UniProtKB/Swiss-Prot annotation:
Pfam family of the protein (one): Cupin_2
Function summary: Part of the gene cluster that mediates the biosynthesis of oryzines, natural products with an unusual maleidride backbone. The two subunits of the fungal fatty acid synthase oryfasA and oryfasB probably form octenoic acid. This fatty acid is most likely activated by the acyl-CoA ligase oryP to give octenyl-CoA before the citrate synthase-like protein oryE catalyzes condensation with oxaloacetate to form tricarboxylic acid.
The encoding gene: oryJ
Protein name: Oryzines biosynthesis cluster protein J
Domain spans labelled Cupin type-2: 88-148
Pathway: Secondary metabolite biosynthesis
Domain of life, per lineage: Eukaryota
SUPFAM superfamilies: RmlC-like cupins
Signal peptide stretch: none
Length: 179
């Protein structure tokens, strides 16, 4: 693909609240507020904004924070069974889409640029800044249509029960690239 242009997006910060031992609300200080991106070889950069291992979330004794700290070091799978994953994704200009289906309900919000969402049946939607997609267990892909600019999205993925269509359970499918 050659060299990438500079991202001109604002720095993202993560602010997490918690409680002091006396019950006073405060901000978590052991997890850095400025985020660090993970560059991949599939044309996207990831940032794991937060994870939950279960619902309802175990907030007492910072159990959820401790699990998230572990996930920052030992990256979780795409989805945590029974939980939730919040990710930022920066799409490189002209990156090839990766088709995938997860057993999740995903809320995808375009933060910067434009993204094309395509479902396996061939239908497409061009999403612009501020648009939201609710992805419900379909085989789909995301594409940055720009050849010169990055695009950024925020995803909130919640675990779901598998979709059953015509008596067939549609499970997870990751990594199939269609051109």
């Amino acid at each position: 693909m050659g060299s990438l242009p500079e991202k001109d997006f604002p720095q993202v910060h993560r602010f997490i609240t918690t409680h002091k031992e006396d019950g006073t609300p405060t901000f978590e200080t052991k997890i850095p507020e400025p985020i660090e991106w993970e560059r991949t070889n599939i044309g996207v950069d990831f940032f794991l904004a937060y994870t939950l291992g279960s619902f309802p979330a175990p907030l007492s004794h910072d159990a959820d924070l401790n699990q998230y700290k572990d996930h920052l070091v030992n990256h979780p799978p795409f989805m945590i069974p029974g939980g939730a994953v919040v990710r930022y994704v920066d799409y490189h200009p002209g990156c090839e889409p990766m088709w995938h289906r997860t057993v999740t309900v995903d809320f995808g919000v375009v933060i910067e640029g434009e993204l094309e969402l395509e479902v396996e049946g061939g239908e497409k939607r061009l999403m612009k800044r501020g648009d939201v997609a609710v992805q419900r267990g379909t085989n789909h892909c995301w594409r940055n249509p720009s050849k010169t600019q990055f695009a950024r999205a925020l995803y909130i993925a919640l675990d779901a029960k598998p979709v059953i269509v015509n008596g067939q359970e549609l499970g997870e499918s990751l990594g199939e690239v269609k051109h």
